[in-house]
Design a protein with these regions (language model features):
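Intrinsically disordered, low-complexity protein-interaction/activation regions
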Residues: 1-183, 187, 250-261
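Recognition helices and adjacent regulatory flanks at domain boundaries
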Residues: 157, 163-261
């Protein structure tokens, strides 16, 4: 069994440790195949992802040479495996990844499970989300972002990461752990200043910590940023949180309430 990691720089691990894939071209090619998530990818797609607008003169031969090197490398890691993980047929190229072998797929699965658990078992959801978020070692694919397809996949996984963080903060707020996440929430809101849900969660955490003035100031700063940068007003959800703070709505201090609607 191999373990592939793309939530950060590409890593391939065997039971014996980490495996090196030499050269940026081969690393990028493996990343593209992993981004395909089991789909066949055409040679044209692989060439565009690896070489962009400057492909080699004989791109078909160059691609096949790198494919052959990767296939030999993978075969050396699993000499008993038949057929090869790297499949070639008229539809293109496909890297076979078994269930549980790709960290990004495992991450998305765990986040989905945690979302389903959130209302019935927020403590369990929080633990699962912490574990899932710990899979991330850096930006998807690290410092080799690849071509259009890889960049699109990276954006999708990054959005899943932010969603997981929202769910994690919801779980912690529902457990009454607002003080424990306050610093992390503030940092996350600074990193993603236009994401309203983080602002809502920070406002609730501040209010519960006895910092009503800071909670309202956070709203005002968000309102100003949305107006100046996007030309829009705060969402109804964000305005509801502000109104609840101004009216000292008891829902804000209920252990199981996060105002997500």
């Amino acid at each position: 069994m191999l373990n592939f990691s793309i939530l950060g720089a590409l890593e391939i691990r065997t039971p014996g440790g980490q495996v090196e894939i030499p050269g940026d071209l081969q690393r990028t090619l493996v990343q593209v195949l992993l981004a395909g998530e089991g789909r066949h990818l055409s040679g044209e797609t692989l060439v565009e992802e690896v070489w962009g607008s400057a492909p080699p003169g004989n791109q078909a031969n160059a691609l096949q040479a790198h494919i052959s090197r990767i296939r030999r490398r993978l075969r050396a890691l699993e000499p008993e495996r038949r057929p090869s993980r790297l499949v070639t047929n008229p539809a293109g190229y496909r890297l076979v990844v078994e269930d549980g072998e790709l960290d990004a797929v495992n991450f998305v699965r765990d986040v989905q499970w945690a979302e389903e658990m959130l209302l019935s078992d927020p403590a369990g959801a929080s633990r699962l989300l912490r574990s899932a978020l710990a899979m991330w070692r850096g930006p998807v694919f690290g410092d080799l972002p690849g071509g259009p397809m890889c960049r699109m996949v990276a954006v999708r996984y990054e959005e899943q990461r932010l969603w997981a963080m929202e769910l994690y903060f919801d779980a912690e707020l529902s457990l009454g752990r607002h003080k424990g996440i306050l610093a992390q929430l503030r940092e996350t809101h600074i990193d993603h200043p236009l994401r309203e849900r983080f602002c809502e969660q920070l406002m609730v955490a501040l209010y519960r910590s006895g910092r009503q003035v800071d909670a309202l100031a956070t709203y005002q700063n968000m309102w100003k940023r949305l107006s100046e940068e996007l030309g829009v007003q705060p969402s109804p959800s964000l305005r509801r949180v502000e109104h609840a703070i101004l009216s000292h709505d008891p829902v804000l201090t209920a252990a199981d309430a996060t105002l997500r609607q």
